[in-house]
């Protein structure tokens, strides 16, 4: 016989029992909610008008029927909106959707519950089919109808529910068949779904944020120009410093070429101390204009205009002219100062002060940038500094600019960017922030997560077909699609890749076609259309006579330009929605790996990301939720990545994905040349001479497919 427990043991056991009593227990479990980023720490991104696909695993004990709904709230909404979720047996998962019809910050969450009436109704139906007695079940149904009547404020619904309860319990005057018929009636089911309150309603503990941006954040063609170089090139004469009016004269041609955004490097007064000369010389001449990234002198800082460009009124006129042509102006937002910037005298503590009292200039050893002082965004007076940096953005928004290309954000405190972007977009949700961060992938991803609308990419250094395939697959078919919008710039004032240096004009045409068809966001810097490819020295990515340090007027219509390519490709992008999406990109086999072959599908797949794994929403569910509009066109793109030699291959067409039978011929039309080809089956022949064309952009002509059948 075991010993009697000591009193102390008994007391401890009782205390333990009290401690283990649950304060609150949820009968229904909601988990694996999508979309969400890092457990809800950061918002996911969408574009206004998008239908957001939502998913969740909803679990409980037993076999009762469950119900679930998406709760969403848009900007300035006073209350939550609910939309039902649908259950898929095969994936054992719930799916829902809602449309984000305004820009700004949205939030959503999931609610789930035991659907008592649906559970009761299903059991009743099974017992009726089995010929079992259901009198007690009908009484239970009557009780639920009365409960629902007490919770509704709709008089007609209350009356109908009370009448139903009476009918279900009426054994004397109502035939059993009629009572059963009413119990299983679809109208009653709908009524109960609306008015019977769940007894175990469970809400997912987090509200997930979605940042909804305007359309230009997803699809746009960017063009970078220095206003000071937009003058006429006169042989034998020194170049004249351009103005905003000179730059405005170029806008009609840029609009004609199909660009959407005109991006300007810094337009502020340029420092004089340690001013850089031509080709980054440390010994400038008297007429050298300096680098516009050395911001500020006695004429002002980040909220001032370089007088050589014009006045603030001239800038306002330039912005207005651009808008009148369907173009938007983007400004460079570079948080750094020249030694002559007003802030250096007014707030020396906003910079890194060395032990000898001097201010630390920018450097990336062994490189030195004596003309630039970095700001110390983690200084003791950072609240005032952060406010001043925010006010710069707000100032230019006041002058019609709502797109900012941010210079080297990875060298500033991440917490600052999350704060300043949130501050600006709270008041001006239409504002776009573009991160110019060529750094480690995790740092680039972090900037995108914390708020940057779009980001530069490694595209410039991805030139072989396998590199492009691998990198673009990461951008478009990984969890990065929830937060990272890559803008594929083909060149920048800092980056002239050797592919362009050694590949000549055909290489420029190849890179243009790739960037503009692989991504809805792409851009170029002035001179690309002229195939400028002379580096300052062999092996360098710096341009000779770099426009960063001197005036570079050009004749943009000189022989050998690729303007016709630009206009045609941008026209294709605008006319066909398939080139305005990301996730509809898929790569397919080319038996010659030098030729890259890919498809831009007529619609984006409905995919949810659970961790690093994709979960495709079942087609029937997606269609019921409003996805799957197949009204667009399918495109097949073949590009020769070798700019020197003719290449030929057999490409493997994904005909089954496009709904084309194995033995059916189909017509593809090249939108670059207007040539038509009749293909059959999966394997088809492609030959590309880079001196004639960089590739094909095939439109699959579905009417022709039907005619050939």
Positions of PLM-derived features:
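Aromatic- and glycine-enriched glycan-recognition loops and surfaces
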Residues: 228-331, 385-388, 417-418, 505, ...
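Carbohydrate-interacting/catalytic domains
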Residues: 1-228, 232, 236-260, 269, ...
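Alpha-amylase-like alpha-glycosidases and glucanotransferases acting on alpha-linked glucans and related
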Residues: 292-320, 324-327, 337-564, 581-582, ...
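Glycine-rich, phosphate-binding/catalytic loops in enzymes
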Residues: 125-126, 279-282, 346-347, 421-423, ...
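Residues immediately flanking
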Residues: 333, 437, 492, 640-641, ...
């Amino acid at each position: 016989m075991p010993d009697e427990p000591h009193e102390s043991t008994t007391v401890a056991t009782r205390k333990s029992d009290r401690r283990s009593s649950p304060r609150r227990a949820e009968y229904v479990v909601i988990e694996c909610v999508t979309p969400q980023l890092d457990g809800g720490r950061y918002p996911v991104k969408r574009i206004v008008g998008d239908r957001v696909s939502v998913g969740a695993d909803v679990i409980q004990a037993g076999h009762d029927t469950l119900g679930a709904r998406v709760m969403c709230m848009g900007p300035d909404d006073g209350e939550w909106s609910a939309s039902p979720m649908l259950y898929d047996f095969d994936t054992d998962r719930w799916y829902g959707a809602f449309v984000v019809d305004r820009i700004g910050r949205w939030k959503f969450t999931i609610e789930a519950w035991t659907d008592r009436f649906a559970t009761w109704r299903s059991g009743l139906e099974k017992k009726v089919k089995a010929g079992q007695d259901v009198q007690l079940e009908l009484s239970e149904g009557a009780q639920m109808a009365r409960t629902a009547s007490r919770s509704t404020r709709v008089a007609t619904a209350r009356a109908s529910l009370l009448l139903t309860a009476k009918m279900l319990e009426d054994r004397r005057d109502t035939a059993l068949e009629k009572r059963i018929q009413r119990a299983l009636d679809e109208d009653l089911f709908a009524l109960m779904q609306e008015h019977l309150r769940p007894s175990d309603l469970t809400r997912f503990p987090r509200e997930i944020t979605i940042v909804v941006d305007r359309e230009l954040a997803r699809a746009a063609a960017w063009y970078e120009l220095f206003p000071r170089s937009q003058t006429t090139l006169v042989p034998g004469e020194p170049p004249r410093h351009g103005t905003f009016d000179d730059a405005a004269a170029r806008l009609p041609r840029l609009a004609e070429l199909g660009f959407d955004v005109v991006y300007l490097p810094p337009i502020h007064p340029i420092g004089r101390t340690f001013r850089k000369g031509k080709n980054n010389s440390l010994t400038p001449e008297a007429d050298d204009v300096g680098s516009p990234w050395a911001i500020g002198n006695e004429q002002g800082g980040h909220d001032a205009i370089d007088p050589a460009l014009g006045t603030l009124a001239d800038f306002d006129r330039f912005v207005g002219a651009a808008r009148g042509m369907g173009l938007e102006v983007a400004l460079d937002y570079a948080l750094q100062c020249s030694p002559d910037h007003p802030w250096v005298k007014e707030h020396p503590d906003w910079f890194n002060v060395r032990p000898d009292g001097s201010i630390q200039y920018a450097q990336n050893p062994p490189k030195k940038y004596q003309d630039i002082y970095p700001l110390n965004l983690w200084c003791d007076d950072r609240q005032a500094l952060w406010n001043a940096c925010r006010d710069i953005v707000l100032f230019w928004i006041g002058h019609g600019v709502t797109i900012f290309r941010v210079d080297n954000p990875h060298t500033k405190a991440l917490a600052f960017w999350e704060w300043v972007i949130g501050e600006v977009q709270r008041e001006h949700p239409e504002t776009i922030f573009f991160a110019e961060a060529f750094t480690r992938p995790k740092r680039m991803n972090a900037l995108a997560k914390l708020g940057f609308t779009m980001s530069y990419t490694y595209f410039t250094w991805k030139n072989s077909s396998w590199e492009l395939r691998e990198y673009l697959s990461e951008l478009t078919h990984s969890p990065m699609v929830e937060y990272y919008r890559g803008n594929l710039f083909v060149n920048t004032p800092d980056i002239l890749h050797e592919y362009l240096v050694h590949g000549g004009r055909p290489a420029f045409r190849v890179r243009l076609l790739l960037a503009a068809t692989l991504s809805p966001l792409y851009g170029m810097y002035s001179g690309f259309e002229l195939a400028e490819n002379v580096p300052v020295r062999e092996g360098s990515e710096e341009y000779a006579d770099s426009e960063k340090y001197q005036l570079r007027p050009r004749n943009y219509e000189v022989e050998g330009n690729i303007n016709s390519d630009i206009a045609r490709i941008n026209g294709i992008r605008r006319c066909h929605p398939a080139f305005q999406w990301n996730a509809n990109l898929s790569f397919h086999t080319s038996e010659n790996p030098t030729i890259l072959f890919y498809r831009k599908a007529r619609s984006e797949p409905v995919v949810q990301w659970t961790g690093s794994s994709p979960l495709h929403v079942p087609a029937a569910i997606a269609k019921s939720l409003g996805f799957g509009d197949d009204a667009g066109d399918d495109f097949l793109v073949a590009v020769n990545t070798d700019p020197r030699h003719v290449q030929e291959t057999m490409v493997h067409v994904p005909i089954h994905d496009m709904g084309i039978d194995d033995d059916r011929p189909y017509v593809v039309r090249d939108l670059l040349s207007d040539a038509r080809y009749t293909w059959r089956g999966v394997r088809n022949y492609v030959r590309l001479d880079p001196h004639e064309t960089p590739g094909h952009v095939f439109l699959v002509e579905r009417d022709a497919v039907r005619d050939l059948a």
